[in-house]
Amino acid sequence: MSLDTVVEDIRDEAQARASEIQADADERAEKIIEEAEADAEDILEERKDEVEEQIEREREQALSSANLEAKQNRLEARRDVLDDVLNRVEDELASLSNAKREELTKPLVTAAITEFDDDETVKLYARADDADLLNSLLEEHEKAEYAGEYDCLGGVVAEGQQSRVRVNNTFDSILDAVWEETLGDVSEQLFDQ
């Protein structure tokens, strides 16, 4: 065997080995690329899922906030309507006719006075516009006297000199009590359909 043949055999063997190594490297590179592409696809799908979940969370949060704001607006509107109803009732009480005012005030005066002992002097306070009415109603009650003004829609506040008892029989206090008792019914009639 000649040297050229040996060199040729070594070269052929080296080329075959190089081709084998190259093919193996290409196969491994292709496998790595396929795995990387699969990983990239998985990562892309994960990111898409995360983005979709984030979008859904933000959408739910926005809907929840909008629903809460709408509910608050409805409640505020209802409160405004109820306040308007209460103000209209107060206006009607403040502008009662003299006959109606006397009809409503007389039992309040009597009820207030009966809360005190028979021998106790009772001082009654009323709104300034009702001073004459109160003085005429007190003509029937010897132990009671008009003592001055009280800021209210009508009715009386009575105080005993000895017992330090105070009875609030004003239209305001009665309206407050009735309003608290009937607020649910009023609200239901106005808003439930």
UniProtKB/Swiss-Prot annotation:
Subunit structure and binding partners: Has multiple subunits with at least A(3), B(3), C, D, E, F, H, I and proteolipid K(x).
Q: Name one Pfam family in it.
A: vATP-synt_E
Q: Where in the cell is it found?
A: Cell membrane
The name on file for this protein is: A-type ATP synthase subunit E
Q: Which domain of life is it from?
A: Archaea
Membrane topology classification: Peripheral membrane protein
The UniProt entry, under PANTHER family, shows: ATPASE H+-TRANSPORTING V1 SUBUNIT E1A-RELATED
Annotated Gene Ontology cellular component terms:
plasma membrane; proton-transporting two-sector ATPase complex, catalytic domain
Q: Which GO terms describe its molecular function?
A: ATP binding; proton-transporting ATP synthase activity, rotational mechanism; proton-transporting ATPase activity, rotational mechanism
* NCBIfam families per record: PRK02292.1 (NF002629)
GO biological process, alphabetically ordered: proton motive force-driven plasma membrane ATP synthesis
